[in-house]
Amino acid sequence: VRDYISGMVILGEDQYRVGELVKINGYEGYVEEVGLRLTKLRDFDGSLHIIQNGNISVVTNQARHPMMVKTEIYVDKTLDPERVNMALERALERINGEGYKKEVVTKFINQGICNMTDFDAVYSLYGFVKPETQWRMDRIIREIAIEELLKDGLVRERTLGERS
């Protein structure tokens, strides 16, 4: 009975729909089925999670609101931070420009150095994008950042065995 009542609440409140990306009780995937008794999620590895609606305590719907993309760029810490920031700002101008207008919800910003490793300064770039574009935009940001850093000679080759 609890499963059915919970199913009616889920459907009545339109908490999630078939095809949406959600997290339910720690399981993440695309909703394949929403019934009165059960919800079925398809995980990224292909696993099918079958969850009794009465056991659902936490739902995070990732398909209805903008998602944050936080991209960390590792750069040799001996390089001039001002030059690195200038290259990253050019990268963000490209990301925030016309070419990605459909994906970007809030302009990306450079937070500067957010961490250090033995070899690198870690720069953090972040912004919000439309749901389900966050992975693609993260890759694009990395590619464009590398292009801009290369233009200024701010990327070095690592030697074998060197770690970041």
Name these PLM-found stretches:
Residues V1-R2, G127:
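Alpha-helical transmembrane segments
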Residues R2, R37-K40, R142:
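Basic side chains
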Residues R2-G7, Y16-R17, R139:
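Short helix-terminus and kink motifs of transmembrane alpha helices
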Residues D3, V69-K70, Y123:
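Positions in alpha-helical segments
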Residues S6-V9, K130:
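A broad detector of the eukaryotic-type serine/threonine protein kinase catalytic domain
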Residues V9-K102:
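Soluble accessory domains appended to multi-pass membrane transport proteins
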Residues L79, G99-S164:
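Solvent-exposed, non-transmembrane regulatory segments of membrane-associated proteins
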